[in-house]
Regions:
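Active-site HxH/HxHxD metal-binding segment of metal-dependent hydrolases
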Residues: 117-186
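Metallo-beta-lactamase
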Residues: 158-204, 211-212, 242-245, 252
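N-terminal secretory signal peptides
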Residues: 1-12, 22-26, 39
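Zn-dependent metallo-beta-lactamase
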Residues: 20-97
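Active-site neighborhood of phospho(di)ester-bond hydrolases with catalytic His/Asp-centered motifs
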Residues: 102-104, 130-137, 155-157, 217-219, ...
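Conserved beta-strand hairpin/beta-sheet module of binuclear metal-dependent hydrolase folds
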Residues: 71-118, 207-210, 215-220
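C-terminal regulatory/interaction regions
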Residues: 17, 296-361
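Divalent-metal (often Zn2+) His-rich catalytic cores of metallo-beta-lactamase-fold enzymes
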Residues: 242-306
Length: 361
């Protein structure tokens, strides 16, 4: 990353932290609790935390340097382009009728139009966004939608519309064009195939296929070169999430737009992700068959939740350890997030698949 890009990144992070602090300060969470919350003894003093050390990021996981304005834009194939701020990704397709935009991440924000302007000027094409496709309803991938005005045709799954109407967020206008299973977007001589294959990260997360550009966009499933963050990218349907890469690989494509991290993905990235999650699942099954719950529940007696926590922590740590050892240096942040991912896979194995459940005699 260039120094100027680092400054841009730091500025955006400072803005985020400042905004978060303001929101937290304005919220009266304590008011809903009887008697409120006691102030810490030294409310005015904040100690400097001791931060953990983590393994270096493998060079293969890193993307290209950002420009002075904090973004990178490049061609995927022909007139399909991708944009990243190093953490989030978007894509756009230039056509003779205007620009088709796919997701509008809040952190990229106004840089989306700057990236489009840059490409349009270089190629002598229109920079007007005519259509915006939502991958799903989450604000981190759609929070800059309102920047493109009211005349843009917004397209999404029918559940995306329901959820956005529920959320009533003015930054994310609900799509006016919706579909249940399949929709082909035709505009300016181009075609894009949208499909819903069931719940995964969210109930409305869709597959965006560019058949004439050898590209698939599937957001919040595989982070190319990186492990998933908390709880499989904060996914709502774990079995659906785990199955999604197999569906992705059933499409013909060469380039993968994941919605996150700073580089494009490949089919090998998706295969590696599958192996990582499969290893976690196998290790969880071994841990469930190996770790004895008895000492945890005996030790804590009537405090059942303490027994549950310490037992599941022990199973999770047992299952995560060999996976962390195998993938550190292969997938970025393996040592950061594998334990939290292991817990959610473990619980899905127990609760969704019934592994380890015992019926009282």
């Amino acid at each position: 990353m260039t120094p100027s890009a680092s400054r841009a990144s730091a500025t955006s992070r400072r803005s985020f932290l400042t905004g978060t602090a303001a929101v937290m300060g304005a919220s009266s969470i304590a008011a809903v609790l009887p008697g409120g919350l006691a102030e810490p003894a030294s409310a005015g003093a904040v100690s400097t935390p001791t931060l953990p050390d983590y393994a270096p990021v493998p060079p293969s996981s890193l993307g290209p340097a950002l420009n002075d304005q904090g973004y990178y834009v490049a061609r995927v194939k022909r007139n399909l382009y991708w944009v990243t701020d190093g953490t989030y990704q978007s894509a756009f397709l230039t056509t003779r009728a205007g620009v088709l935009l796919f997701d509008a991440p809040a952190t990229i924000g106004h840089n989306l139009q700057r990236a489009i302007n840059e490409i349009a000027a270089a190629n002598g094409v229109s920079n007007t966004v005519t259509h915006l496709v939502y991958s799903h309803h989450h604000a981190d991938h759609a929070g800059a939608s309102s920047l493109f005005g009211k005349d843009v045709v917004r397209i999404g799954h029918e559940e995306t519309r329901r959820l956005l109407l529920r959320d009533n967020d003015p930054t994310r206008p609900a799509p006016t064009v919706t579909f249940a299973d399949r929709y082909t977007l035709h505009s300016g001589g181009e075609r894009v195939q949208l499909a819903w294959h069931g719940s995964n990260h969210t109930p409305d997360n869709i597959y965006i296929h560019f058949p004439d550009h050898d590209t698939l966009m599937l957001v919040d499933i595989v982070n190319s070169g990186w492990v998933p963050i908390y709880n499989l990218n904060l996914s709502e349907d774990v079995p659906g999430y785990i199955a999604a890469p197999t569906t992705a690989l059933s499409y013909p494509w060469k380039h993968f737009i994941s919605g996150h991290v700073g580089r494009l993905g490949t089919r090998n990235d998706v295969h590696l992700h599958q192996q990582y999650v499969a290893d976690i699942a196998a290790s969880c099954k071994t841990a469930l068959a190996t770790v004895d719950p008895t000492p945890y529940f005996v030790n804590y007696g009537a405090n059942q939740w303490a027994g549950v926590k310490t037992y599941l922590d022990a199973v999770t740590d047992y299952a995560a350890a060999p996976v962390i050892a195998k993938y550190t240096g292969v997938l970025a942040a393996t040592d950061v997030f594998t334990t939290s991912t292991t817990l959610v896979v473990l619980e899905s194995i127990r609760l969704d698949l019934g592994v380890g459940s015992q019926v009282h005699p």
